[in-house]
Every structure is written in C-alpha cells, then in structure tokens.
C-alpha cells in the first residue's frame, strides 16, 4: 500500500499519512510560546532531571559535533554548547519553525553563540552529510514523527562510526498502580492545564494520546536495531513513565 493510501495515528485518531505532519505542526505552533512553562507544570519539574541524566550519558566532549533533533526550546542544546566548546558545534534542529524560533531566542539571550546553528529539518530526511555527528539526541520528539523507522535510519546515516543516538521519550509505566494514576493525570490534568495556560486543551489531549500510541521500551529497542544501531540499551526513569534508549553506530 502506498503512503498516499495509508493512515497513521494522530493521538487516538487515524488520519491520512501525509496529514499527520501538518496536524503535529499545528499543535506545536499553538503551544511554542508556553512550551517551557507547560513542561515544568506537567512534570512538576521532573523533566529537568530526565534531561540532566540524558546529558550525563551522552558522552559529549570538547570538539564534538552534536545534533539536538526535535530540540525545540533548546534545553539540551544549551548544555551541549558548553560541553563541546568553541572547537565543536551543536545543531539545534526542529521541524517546527515556531519552536525553533523560541529556542533560538532563548539560547541567544543566554549567551549561547558561536558554536551553534539552527536548522529547520524533518527527521525523516535529515539534510546533513553521512557520518557527520558524534552524538544525536532526540528528546520527547520521536513520538510525533510520522515514519519513525525512516527517521531512525536517517539518524543512523548521519552519525559517525562510533557515534551514539540517545532517545528520551515517554514510554510505558512498569508499575500497574503507577500506570493507572498516570492515565488519570494525563487525560484529565494535561488538557485542563493546556486550556488554562495556553487556551488550547486539544493540543494537550493529543500529547497525552500520542504517548499511549508510542512504541513501548522493547519495541523501540528493536526498531533501533532494525535501523542499523548496535548495543541498544534502555533505562527506565520514574517507573517507566519515561525511558532513555541509547544505540551506537559501528
């Protein structure tokens, strides 16, 4: 079946394959200005710990080339700029122009200049040379990609041999009671907060649904192997609400 006739998940709704990207773009254009505030409110600030652990496991060193993909408002990119120094380079990339503009303004105001570039790009067809990056991160972005397999293969292509991909993403809670509480919170509190803070409950309803449709820990691990990565491992965080997957290219 051609992609023109295929459907895919947009939250719990099936939409034509080619429409998902437009719908996801609408979500993030809507929430970009309040994205950081909502992250703090939704996660009670815990997202900062998840990202800190991701940075600690990235292995990024001075002189590295790093791609922060679907990097949004630049939380990871800012730290990577400090880690690579002026000898290295960080590319903050996002498919959404509104998110990228917020990230650029935020990082510029924090003094992150000289070793960072901003590139609007689709993860499924990255506009970078083969074997270019030492490290790629994608934080809370993969679940919004239409063709995840294609995106993972594209990431593998642009990684140097010996390079690593880190995927930080919502996953499947491994504690039954936590899963029930998390469901209640996600489907009731998130849209409510979205309505109050961004005047957009529907976008946060989609975000809650998209988490449930994202591949679980083992499925994503196998997808990374299938895309060409080796030694893929994952670490559950906060009882599996979030998982960090790491894969290497050899």
UniProtKB/Swiss-Prot annotation:
Pfam families for this protein: Ubie_methyltran (PF01209)
GO biological process: aerobic respiration; menaquinone biosynthetic process; methylation
GO MF term list: 2-methoxy-6-polyprenyl-1,4-benzoquinol methyltransferase activity; demethylmenaquinone methyltransferase activity
Enzyme class: transferase
Annotated disulfide bonds: none
PROSITE patterns according to UniProt: SAM_MT_UBIE, UBIE_1, UBIE_2
Source taxon at top rank: Bacteria
InterPro entries xrefs: SAM-dependent_MTases_sf, UbiE/COQ5_MeTrFase, UbiE/COQ5_MeTrFase_CS
CDD domains referenced in this protein's UniProt entry, alphabetically: AdoMet_MTases
Pathway this chain belongs to: Quinol/quinone metabolism; menaquinone biosynthesis; menaquinol from 1,4-dihydroxy-2-naphthoate: step 2/2; Cofactor biosynthesis; ubiquinone biosynthesis
EC assignment: 2.1.1.163, 2.1.1.201
Catalysed transformations (reactions): a 2-demethylmenaquinol + S-adenosyl-L-methionine = a menaquinol + S-adenosyl-L-homocysteine + H(+); a 2-methoxy-6-(all-trans-polyprenyl)benzene-1,4-diol + S-adenosyl-L-methionine = a 5-methoxy-2-methyl-3-(all-trans-polyprenyl)benzene-1,4-diol + S-adenosyl-L-homocysteine + H(+)
Positions annotated to bind S-adenosyl-L-methionine: 73, 94, 122-123, 139
Function: Methyltransferase required for the conversion of demethylmenaquinol (DMKH2) to menaquinol (MKH2) and the conversion of 2-polyprenyl-6-methoxy-1,4-benzoquinol (DDMQH2) to 2-polyprenyl-3-methyl-6-methoxy-1,4-benzoquinol (DMQH2).
HAMAP family the record matches: MenG_UbiE_methyltr
Record-stated family: Belongs to the class I-like SAM-binding methyltransferase superfamily. MenG/UbiE family.
Protein name: Ubiquinone/menaquinone biosynthesis C-methyltransferase UbiE
Organism: Francisella tularensis subsp. novicida (strain U112)
Lineage summary: Bacteria, Pseudomonadati, Pseudomonadota, Gammaproteobacteria, Thiotrichales
Gene (name only): ubiE
């Amino acid at each position: 079946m051609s992609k023109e006739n295929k459907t895919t998940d947009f939250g719990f709704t099936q939409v034509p394959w080619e429409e998902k990207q437009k719908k996801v773009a609408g979500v993030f254009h809507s929430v970009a200005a309040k994205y950081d505030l909502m992250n703090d409110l939704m996660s009670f600030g815990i997202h900062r710990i998840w990202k800190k652990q991701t940075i600690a496991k990235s292995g990024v060193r001075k002189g590295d080339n790093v791609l922060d993909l679907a990097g949004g408002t630049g939380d990871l990119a800012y730290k990577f700029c400090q880690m690579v120094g002026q000898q290295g380079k960080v590319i903050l990339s996002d498919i959404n122009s509104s998110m990228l503009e917020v990230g650029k303004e935020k990082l510029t105001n924090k003094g992150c200049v000289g070793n960072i570039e901003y590139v609007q790009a689709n993860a499924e067809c990255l506009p970078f040379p083969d074997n270019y990056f030492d490290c790629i991160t994608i934080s809370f972005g993969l679940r919004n990609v239409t063709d995840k397999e294609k995106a993972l293969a594209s990431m593998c292509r642009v990684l140097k041999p010996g390079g690593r991909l880190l995927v930080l993403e919502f996953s499947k809670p491994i504690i039954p009671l936590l899963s029930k509480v998390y469901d209640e919170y996600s489907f009731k509190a998130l849209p409510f907060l979205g309505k109050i803070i961004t005047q957009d409950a529907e976008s946060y309803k989609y975000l809650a649904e998209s988490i449930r449709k994202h591949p679980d820990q083992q499925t994503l691990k196998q997808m990374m192997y299938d895309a060409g990565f080796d030694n893929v491992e994952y670490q559950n965080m906060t009882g599996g609400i979030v998982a960090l997957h790491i894969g290497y290219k050899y």
